[in-house]
Amino acid sequence: LSEYLKRRYNARVHRLVIDASFTCPNREKSGPCIFCDPTGSGFNALHDLSIREQVLKQREWAMKKYNATKFIAYFQSFSNTYAPVDVLRERYSEALVDDSIVQLAISTRPDCVPEEVLELLDEFKTKVDVSLELGLQTINPKTLRILRRGHGVAEFIDAVLRAKKHGLEVVAHVIVDLPWDELEDVIDTAKTLSYLGVDGVKMHSLYVVEDSPLGEMFKEGAFQPVSFEEFLERTIAFLEHLSPNIVIHRLTSDPPKTGTLFARWGLSKWQIINAVETELERRNTFQGAKFKPAGGGQLNRS
């Protein structure tokens, strides 16, 4: 991703993670998704600061450590479209401190994208690039119910199609090693994302945090994480069936440093990335190796 962003913006680009004090409709109704912790799966240590202060402090650090000169304002925690439009406009605007912010990335649920929000994001497209990150996790409806996602596949498809009509860049989040999924579910997820024409994918590995429903299930022995070998098999299959035009934003998760019951089989992020790359090379395969365009890829010869 870093090389892709460098080519796109002709500069070193760094992502600034923002906690804008939003919440989530699930938490107000039936409770959070089972994997979500009290921070809304966001780990910004600066969440007590204003949005502007979060941006400025992170930017200063990234400029010194990475020599970054351009930045993505990434609204990560909870559902970042779940508020009145006027509130959203104010908080998004606060992140655009100056011209060094080249992209606004908004992470949310597919059932929290009403038309007025898409129209608001249209407004921001005149100032910066805008990407909409939508959590799908899996194409398997039974697994979605176990995860307590509170939406189905149809809502995700609807959100993607409407966002694309507005010319928005769409990034999908998936978890490839869900214990309730099979290999076929992972492959079908890759195919669906490809046919929908999403622009990017963030692939996550399942981790278990203490203060979450999943954490309680883990301690009770209600499920077993899949093995690393199975994770690797699913990751390779997902990549093979994914359109080569889709940008891979990540290959594994970044779990919190404390309060984690299970994460990445005790491996570092780079060990997992290296293992995936090594396995791709060993099998002489690549992203899109088994991808077939919609309609079976048959040319119309009439």
Residue ranges of model-derived segments:
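Auxiliary Fe-S-binding modules of radical SAM enzymes
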Residues: L1-E3, Y9-V13, G200, V208-S302
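N-terminal [4Fe-4S]-dependent radical SAM core
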Residues: L1-I72
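Hydrophobic faces of well-ordered beta-strands that scaffold small-molecule active sites
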Residues: H14-I18, F71-Q76, L104-I106, V130-L134, ...
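Active-site-proximal loop/turn and secondary-structure-junction residues that shape catalytic pockets
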Residues: F22, S77-T81, P110-C112, L136-N140, ...
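Structural recognition of alpha->loop->beta junctions
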Residues: C33, E94-I101, D188-K202, I272-F286
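Core AdoMet radical
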Residues: T39-Q58, Y66-V85, S100-V113, D129-E155, ...
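Acidic (Asp/Glu)-rich catalytic clusters
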Residues: A62-Y66, Y92-D99, E119-D129, L161-K165
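Conserved C-terminal portion of the radical SAM core fold
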Residues: A154-P213, E229-T252
